């Protein structure tokens, strides 16, 4: 079935209805919070948001107890991974009273182009891809730019390594060699047959990680393999499009035995970069960094200008053609106002 294209007025009307529904839900939650705070609440304590359900969240206390909590109306938007101050209620539902400062946050633009945090206090972003759906360097590079921009260490993860065969091995190897040459950590695993899963566990232990990647690459299957007994919905590739069907519906935080945490978030087909500038994109290509600022012209676009340090590095083989093509493709997809 063809995707329905909405007019601007239809999109505005849908957005307005959603905002009105959200406002009504927020008013109901505000009344619930007032009722709770008018009764008996426990002392303030710190906890971590491990799941978000719109107007309510699940919070885990220091002793491992999980409670559903209302949100005070004056709080900023909370996401999975946030550290908070909360008070337990005598009816089993508590109240979040404050958000603690974030060490890091991973953001992406929403449909209106406004930045929306999707995870907090993450120190490792695991970029998952697979032989099927076919991996594209441009999408991987977008995730790498987002990780570099957020100051979060990336880890490249090829899942479904058991699907590498004669038909795709050459292309997969060439893709992996690009990122190995750049020095990015990269692990090849299979959640299906257990290949290198112990190596992955070692890389995740002691970190707060988030898995990102297009749908169908097996993020939820990886969670099931890493944490047996965890109930996550797993989908397969669409038989019509060959793209992944979205399965996980809300970001959740899980604990690894070694002390690390995993935030499993909904799959997305393409990661937007509307929140970064041209300078941010350039800085996200790590092989560009020592060259930036050394072009003959200060406003060099690294296209055909004489004396361009990046073009000289491309000619000398210090920048790979695939990476330069990806850089140009990403810039071409950005609004001209960001240039």
Curated annotation (Swiss-Prot):
GTP binds at residues 159-162, 213-221. It comes from the Bacteria. It is found in: Cytoplasm. One of its GO terms (cellular component) is cytoplasm. Zn(2+) binds at residues 295, 300, 302, 308. It is an enzyme of class 3 (hydrolase). The keyword Hydrolase applies. Its EC number is 3.6.1.-. Binds 1 zinc ion per subunit. One of its GO terms (biological process) is ribosomal small subunit biogenesis. GO terms for molecular function: GTP binding; GTPase activity; metal ion binding; rRNA binding. Residues 111-271 form the CP-type G domain. InterPro entries: G_CP_dom (IPR030378), NA-bd_OB-fold (IPR012340), P-loop_NTPase (IPR027417), Ribosome_biogen_GTPase_RsgA (IPR004881), RsgA_GTPase_dom (IPR010914). Its main location: cytoplasm. It holds the Pfam family RsgA_GTPase. Keywords: Cytoplasm, GTP-binding, Hydrolase, Metal-binding, Nucleotide-binding, Ribosome biogenesis, RNA-binding, rRNA-binding, Zinc. Its cofactor is Zn(2+). One of several proteins that assist in the late maturation steps of the functional core of the 30S ribosomal subunit. Helps release RbfA from mature subunits. May play a role in the assembly of ribosomal proteins into the subunit. Circularly permuted GTPase that catalyzes slow GTP hydrolysis, GTPase activity is stimulated by the 30S ribosomal subunit. Monomer. Associates with 30S ribosomal subunit, binds 16S rRNA. PANTHER family: SMALL RIBOSOMAL SUBUNIT BIOGENESIS GTPASE RSGA, SMALL RIBOSOMAL SUBUNIT BIOGENESIS GTPASE RSGA 1, MITOCHONDRIAL-RELATED. HAMAP family: GTPase_RsgA. Belongs to the TRAFAC class YlqF/YawG GTPase family. RsgA subfamily. NCBIfam families: PRK12288.1, ribosome small subunit-dependent GTPase A. This is Small ribosomal subunit biogenesis GTPase RsgA. It comes from Pseudomonas aeruginosa (strain LESB58).
């Amino acid at each position: 079935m063809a995707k329905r294209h909405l007019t601007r007025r239809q999109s505005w009307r849908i957005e307005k209805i959603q905002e009105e529904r959200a406002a009504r839900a927020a008013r109901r939650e505000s009344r619930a919070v007032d009722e709770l705070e008018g009764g008996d609440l426990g002392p303030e304590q710190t906890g971590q948001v491990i799941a978000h359900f719109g107007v309510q969240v699940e919070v885990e206390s220091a002793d491992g107890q999980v409670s559903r909590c209302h949100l005070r109306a004056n709080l900023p938007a909370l996401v999975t991974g946030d550290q908070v101050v909360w008070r337990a209620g005598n009816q089993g539902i508590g109240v979040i009273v404050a958000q603690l400062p974030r060490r890091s946050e991973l953001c992406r633009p929403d449909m209106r182009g406004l930045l929306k945090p999707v995870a907090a206090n993450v120190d490792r972003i695991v970029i998952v891809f697979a032989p099927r759906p076919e991996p594209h360097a441009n999408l991987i590079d977008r995730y790498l730019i987002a990780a570099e921009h957020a100051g979060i260490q990336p880890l490249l993860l090829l899942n479904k390594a058991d699907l590498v065969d004669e038909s795709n091995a050459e292309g997969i190897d060439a893709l992996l060699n690009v990122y190995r040459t750049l020095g990015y950590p990269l692990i090849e695993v299979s959640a299906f047959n257990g290949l290198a899963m112990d190596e992955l566990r070692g890389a995740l232990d002691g970190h707060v990680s988030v898995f990102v990647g297009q749908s169908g690459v097996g993020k939820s299957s990886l969670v099931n393999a890493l944490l047996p007994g965890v109930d996550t919905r797993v989908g397969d590739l669409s038989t019509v499009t060959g793209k992944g069907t979205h399965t996980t519906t809300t970001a959740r935080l899980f604990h690894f035995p070694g002390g690390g945490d995993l935030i499993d978030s909904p799959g997305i087909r393409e990661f937007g970069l509307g929140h970064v500038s041209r300078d941010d994109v350039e800085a996200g290509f790590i092989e560009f960094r020592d060259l930036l600022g050394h072009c003959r012209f200060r406003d060099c676009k690294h296209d055909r200008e004489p004396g361009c340090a990046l073009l000289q590095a491309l000619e000398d083989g210090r920048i790979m053609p695939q990476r330069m093509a990806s850089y140009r493709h990403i810039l071409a997809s950005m609004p001209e106002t960001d240039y």
